[in-house]
Regions:
Chain B
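Charged, E/D/K/R/S-rich low-complexity terminal regions of large eukaryotic assembly subunits
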Residues: 1-94, 98-370
Length: 955, 370
């Protein structure tokens, strides 16, 4: 027996957390039959020192607190011996403080055995002293004063622990003999309870009462505290006024330094049971909920899960009350102390106002859930357990939404709907299905449990608590019974799209701008993961979110980034390479993907973050289950970049001015090429680089092999089709690269040979080559009778290419000379120079993007890069223009008023895209690109003229 | 039926009565002369001199509507015209415009109808609608109705391109009525002078491909996106069927007992030309035999057709009759020319710069001297 105990004990001590778990249970562990935790603890700490358990001196905070208690008790014994009441009084006060500390650490309300023992000792001694009148007379005045003080104090104090004391008196010695056995039992029973259970029980004194009483009835302790509020009074005699007064008292104490938050919750929930009228109960419940929110004061840590669950239940009760008495109104505007409205009984007809805001509660609860998911390690079981609470939240949200809709407050309903959307949007159908099944299962279990106890207990409890609850309730029965009115299980439509549509439509109709924008992004995300690229894209473009998102808060921007990432993945699955690249390239442009998606923090070499920023960032992180797989994302980004960039590089060996499509990709490639030795590919980048090398030689087979050997593909659903798509794309791009690279060295290329080389059907080869001819990328033409491509060898020789480059540089030189001259003579100093410089660049852009390779290369490269981001942005421009000028944008869900988006937003982000139009196949509106360019050119041209006029006029 | 008739007649009577004063007023040309362009004045005048108030005007509208429903389109058209001059309610005036347009279309007065379309278009564009959505709807409707006119009016093919390609209407097509693309594409193909819009059209087609495609749009796509000539041929055949079965496109004209579908012939001819042109652009040497097959002509016809094209300077090519091939001339920019072009202006610019510089420095020294 003993050995078992010790081994267990040592186990627990080797792991800090478990220690605390075990220790938590100690005061409660005695339920079994009057165990003596204090002795146990003493033994425990003794064992640390005396036994050869090894050199471990790790002791939890609880141990220390208990030790302190023990010490103080010892001191008191000494003081008693010398009859020093002054010291005794001090010690007593210290003891009480320590008790508080102990209770806080163990999160329990029961007093440890040792405390009771000290009290008993003290009482006995006090009585003895009082009886002994001689001794009293002999005392010094200060001592006598202390004695009197103690007399009163102790009387008051002991009332709290009356029951405990009595029990202790009943069997004061038992502990010594049974110590080991008891301890063993303790340890065992401690194992039996999970942490959650314990905390939950301690959090709610009502249930605790019941449990303890039915557990054998012996162990009653300090948790009678709340009752002390109405001392010696049968709960039935408590009047409305008393409750009201008490409530006010508690509220006033709220937020004060010395107030114990957990205790406040208890007091309030006790009050809730005593409440006389539904309205009062409601009022108290509201305060209970806010007090529960207060339990966790820090922004960074989350609310204890048990408290969270309780809180949800409480809010449900509030909803019950509200549903049962529709005349009770809850709003924030009503003065809490205005009149004694809550006195009116259940049969009162008129409207009663109670202060409170359901939506705020709901949002807070959601935030706490989110935070707890952020904090819990995603690889533990806790995390999964926590995720299971999501349906519970969904239920609550659903009910709150129903309530708010009943009130007709559609704006609030939209807010609630958004919360629900944010719990659903990232779930693919399968995950959603799982959640639905889970919630059904849970409600079935809960329902069964509720049936069992339904007859005996009208109280609100969640399924778990009900099952454990006793058959007889000795605690004061609540005066206001609230039957379960609002449904306790969420109703999920079978397809998540349906739920989304339903909620999103509501939000579009009634939400404010931010809510709508967020809902829209969620909608886009949802469409993207269900492979509806075009719907998602159109939603994005028509809402003009990409222009306005820069002005929104950070979490919305993160959502936007997430939506873009999913859109990119979706485009990739639909084999739309350019679109996929356009979606993703921006995310990867800065190399801060993790931060942009809020999936972790990347260390930046260049600027240190201060702790404040880090904290903020941590608060923004997405919980693990919402993450987008970064490896997959990177793979898709690099592959799309490769498919676009390799032929592009091949086509522009000689001229430097050709734009880069993907800068990060180029950089990677450069790094890779500098390596002396290249090993076999290991990570995503290596794979893509290896494929790039193969592809640039036209060796598509190897490229396909390398790409397909990546393990990220197992994350994709329809793997086969995507592999096929990739192969086809690689073949095509290999063909293009091959032609670009080697056509200058051929007089003619046979169609049949190309077909064989790249494994493509004739029509496709013909189409690809024809396209290149039409785009004047390839200077060649078909010779139809012989089925071959005849090259015209228009590729300039090296000398010619250099000459051409030289000419261009001269051009730039002259231009900069002119600019310098203008800056000098035109006046306006540096500012003017900067401005004009910019205009000049615009001009150069407009004039055909003719800019030197090296001169100002950095900047121009960047601009080119951005401008050339291509399809998506330009298309956005096109569509944007179309809507802006049309003055309407409808999305046939009937969300009018979204036109608010398109006015007034000057997006710097996409300006470049606007001005570099006409390069992509997307240009929708004729005005957007071509006219823009024309206008700009004319404008810039005009300015040039006027500048020179200024110059000449001066003389 | 008899009941219905009685009911209708009864209603007619009632409406006629209520609108009578105004109608009698309007039927008197001398009195109509008195109306001026100022609407307020008109209303006031009517009110004072003829006791015609807003009730009567409203009745006129109802009466016109009733006339329209009874099939008396010319009457309805007249009344609606008059009504518009008097109407103050903008909603109603738009309804009146629509009514007028409907009357004209039903009476097949294409010229007048075109005017009406333009008027309606102006109103729709200028009017600030309560919601963009309804504006969009109005636009879409307008485009649908205008199909009647454009495919019957002589100048309709131009008109349709003008209307549909104007920014806002193109947007409306893209958002609301993809099927209208077919008519736009047909009009563009048939219209020789409007080649320039084809690129844009292709962009639109590609953009909307995921929601709408039919043989006509696919034809263009095959030809200009995929350069798939076989596919284009195939689509062309499908196009023929589509055109014949389409209400607007397949309008039949019977002359001397022959039934012809003018649009189809035109379309086929132009489409063939398109194919050939594109084909020539990427080929250096084409076998006439093969070409004639593709163009559904016999060898000689094809040769003649090509010769004609060459003569009309539409094609830079020569026929090699011995080999039976067409040899394209190639034109490619000379690299030397390019460089000369680039550097030509540089000298001038530098010269201007230096002279400016000298002038400035002279001015500066002059001012310093002063």
């Amino acid at each position: 027996m003993a050995s078992r105990f010790w081994t267990q004990n040592s186990d627990s001590e080797s792991e800090e957390e478990e220690v605390s778990d075990l220790e938590d249970d100690i005061p409660l562990g005695g339920e079994g039959g009057g165990a003596l935790p204090s002795k146990y603890l003493q033994g425990d700490s003794d064992s640390d020192e005396s036994d050869d358990q090894g050199p471990r001196m790790v002791r939890s905070a609880k141990d220390k607190r208990f030790d302190e208690l023990v010490q103080t008790t010892e001191q008191m014994k000494n003081y008693m011996k010398i009859n020093d009441w002054v010291q005794l009084q001090e010690s007593f006060e210290r003891l009480n403080k320590q008790l508080e500390k102990v209770n806080r650490v163990t999160e329990s309300v029961t007093a440890p055995r040792i405390y009771i023992k000290a009290l008993v000792m003290l009482e006995d001694f006090l009585n003895a002293t009082l009886v002994n009148k001689d001794a009293k007379k002999k005392m010094s005045p200060s001592n006598a004063k202390s004695l009197n003080y103690m007399k009163q104090k102790l009387k008051k104090n002991n009332k709290l622990f009356e029951a405990d004391i009595e029990k202790f008196r009943a069997n004061p010695e038992s502990e010594v003999e049974d110590e080991i056995d008891e301890d063993d039992e303790d340890a065992e029973s401690a194992d039996g309870f999970s942490d959650d259970d314990i905390v939950e029980r301690t959090m709610n004194s009502d249930e605790e009462d019941e449990e303890q009483e039915d557990d054998g009835g012996g162990w009653t302790s300090a948790e009678k505290k709340p009752k002390e509020m109405f001392p010696k009074m049968d709960p039935g005699q408590i009047s409305w006024e008393m409750v009201d007064k008490k409530l006010k008292e508690i509220i006033v104490a709220r937020g004060r330094k010395g107030t114990d938050r957990a205790e406040q919750v208890e007091q309030l929930s006790y009050l809730a049971r005593c409440a006389k009228t539904p309205a009062q109960k409601l009022e108290v419940m509201v305060h209970v909920v806010s007090a529960q929110f207060d339990v966790n004061p820090s922004l960074n840590t989350h609310m204890p899960i048990a408290v969270w669950k309780k809180c949800v239940q409480n809010v449900l009760v509030i909803l019950d009350i509200l549903a049962q008495y529709p005349n009770i109104k809850m709003d924030e505007t009503s003065e809490p102390e205005a009149e004694n409205e809550t006195e009116k009984g259940a049969d009162y007809e008129g409207s009663i106002h109670v202060w409170g805001n359901m939506v705020a509660f709901l949002e807070r609860i959601d935030d706490e859930l989110f935070k707890s998911l952020q904090c819990i390690d995603p690889h533990t079981k806790d995390y999964v357990e926590r995720l299971r609470d999501e349906p519970l939240f969904m239920t609550l949200a659903q009910n709150v939404q129903a309530y708010v809709e009943r009130l007709g407050d559609m704006r609030a309903a939209a807010r609630v709907a958004l919360r629900r959307v944010e719990h659903v949007y990232y779930k693919p159908q399968e995950v959603y299905e799982a959640m639905r099944k889970l919630s059904e299962l849970q409600s079935r279990v809960g329902g069964a449990a509720a049936e069992i106890v339904a007859g005996e207990d009208g109280e609100e409890k969640d399924g778990e608590a009900v099952m454990k609850a006793s058959t007889e309730t000795k605690g004061p029965a609540p005066f206001v019974l609230t039957p379960e009115i609002v449904p306790r299980r969420p109703s999920f439509p079978s397809v998540n799209r349906k739920l989304m549509d339903q909620l999103v439509t509501l939000i579009y109709k009634h939400g404010d701008e931010r809510t709508r924008a967020r809902a829209m992004l969620c909608d886009i995300y949802q469409h993207a993961i269900s492979d509806e690229f075009y719907t998602a894209r159109d939603l994005l473009l028509m809402s003009h979110l990409q222009e306005s998102v820069m002005n929104m808060d950070i979490s919305t921007q993160i959502l936007f980034n997430r939506a873009m990432a999913q859109l990119g993945l979706c485009a990739f699955r639909e084999s739309l390479v350019t679109e996929a690249h356009n979606c993703l390239s921006e995310l990867y442009a800065g190399g801060r993907v993790k931060e942009l998606l809020a999936q972790g923090v990347s260390q930046s070499r260049y600027h240190e973050k201060n702790p404040e920023q880090e904290k903020l960032e941590r608060r923004r992180q997405m919980p693990f289950h919402m993450h987008i797989n970064l490896e997959l994302l990177e793979a898709v980004h690099l592959i799309t970049a490769m498919l676009l960039e390799v032929p592009n590089m091949a086509s522009s060996v000689h001229d430097m001015k050709r734009k880069m499509i993907s800068k990060p990709f180029r950089r990677l490639l450069d790094i890779n090429e500098k390596q002396m030795f290249t090993g076999p590919p290991e990570n995503v980048r290596d794979h893509v680089m290896a494929a790039t090398r193969a592809l640039s030689k036209g060796d598509w087979k190897k490229a396909v092999e390398v790409i397909q050997s990546m393990d990220v593909w197992r994350l994709l659903g329809q793997r086969e089709s995507i592999m096929e798509m990739l192969q086809e794309k690689l073949q095509e791009e290999a063909l293009r690269t091959y032609i670009f690279t080697y056509s200058p060295y051929f007089e003619s290329l046979s169609l049949d040979q190309l077909m064989v080389m790249f494994g493509l059907p004739e029509a496709q080869v013909h189409s690809i080559v024809s396209k290149m001819m039409i785009a004047e990328e390839l200077h060649a033409s078909w010779d139809q009778p012989t089925r071959c491509v005849v090259t015209h060898n228009m590729e300039p020789t090296r000398l010619q290419a250099l000459a051409s480059q030289f000419a261009e540089k001269l051009n730039v030189l002259v231009e900069s000379n002119e600019k310098a001259f203008d800056a000098r003579t035109g006046g306006g100093g540096l500012e003017g120079l900067g401005r004009r410089n910019k205009e000049g660049q615009d001009y150069a852009d407009a004039a055909g993007g003719r800019r030197g390779g090296d001169f100002g290369g950095n900047r121009s490269g960047f601009r080119n890069n951005r401008g050339g981001r291509g399809g998506r942005d330009n298309q956005a421009g096109g569509r944007g223009a179309r809507d802006n000028q049309g003055g309407f944008n409808n999305y046939n869900r009937g969300n009018q008023g979204r036109s608010g988006y398109n006015s007034g937003y000057q997006s710097t982000r996409y300006q470049d895209a606007y001005s570099s139009a006409g390069r992509t196949p997307y240009q929708a509106g004729p005005a957007s690109g071509i006219n823009n360019r024309g206008v700009q050119q004319a404008d810039a041209g005009g300015r040039m003229v006027s500048l020179s006029r200024v110059g000449s006029n001066r003389f | 039926m008899v009941d219905r008739r009685a009911e209708v007649v009864g209603r007619l009577k009632v409406l006629e009565e209520s609108a009578a004063p105004l109608i009698s007023f309007l039927q008197n040309p001398a009195l109509v002369q008195e109306l001026r362009s100022d609407q307020q004045y008109n209303l006031q005048m009517l009110q004072e001199r003829y006791q015609i108030g807003s009730d009567q005007i409203e009745a006129l509208y109802q009466y016109a509507k009733f006339q329209f429903e009874c099939g008396n389109y010319s009457g309805a058209s007249d009344y609606l015209y008059q009504y518009r001059t008097l109407c103050t309610n903008s909603e109603r005036s738009i309804s009146a415009l629509w009514g007028k347009l409907a009357c004209e279309i039903l009476m097949q007065n294409w010229d007048v109808a075109t005017e009406e379309v333009n008027r309606l278009k102006e109103t729709i564009d200028s009017k600030s609608f309560a919601s963009p959505l309804s504006q969009l709807q109005q636009r879409t409707w307008l485009m649908h109705w205008s199909l009647f006119i454009f495919f019957n009016h002589d100048n309709g093919k131009n008109g349709i391109i003008d209307l549909f390609f104007s920014e806002r209407y193109l947007n409306a097509i893209q958002t609301n009525a993809h099927h209208l693309l077919r008519y736009l594409v047909t009009a563009v193909i048939v219209n020789k002078r409007r080649r320039n819009v084809i690129k844009e059209l292709i962009k639109v087609i590609q953009q909307e491909r995921y929601t709408y495609s039919d043989p006509v749009t696919e034809f263009l796509e095959c030809l200009y996106v995929n350069y798939d000539f076989e596919g284009a041929q195939q689509k062309l055949r499908e196009c023929e069927e589509v055109i014949v079965s389409d209400f607007f496109l397949g309008k039949q004209l019977s002359e001397n007992g022959f039934v012809t579908i003018p649009l189809r012939d035109e379309f086929m001819e132009n489409a063939r030309l398109f194919i050939f042109e594109t084909y020539c652009r990427i080929h250096q040497c084409i076998d006439i035999g093969m070409l004639s097959q593709k163009l559904n002509m016999n060898y000689d016809d094809a040769a003649r057709w090509i010769a004609n094209l060459i003569r009309n300077a539409r094609l830079d090519a020569k026929i090699d009759s011995k080999m039976g091939t067409v040899v394209m001339g190639t034109q490619s920019p000379n690299i030397y020319e390019q460089i000369i072009e680039k550097t030509k202006v540089l000298g001038q610019r530098s010269y201007a710069l230096t002279s400016n510089l000298i002038l400035t420095s002279a001015a500066v020294t002059a001012s310093a001297a002063q």
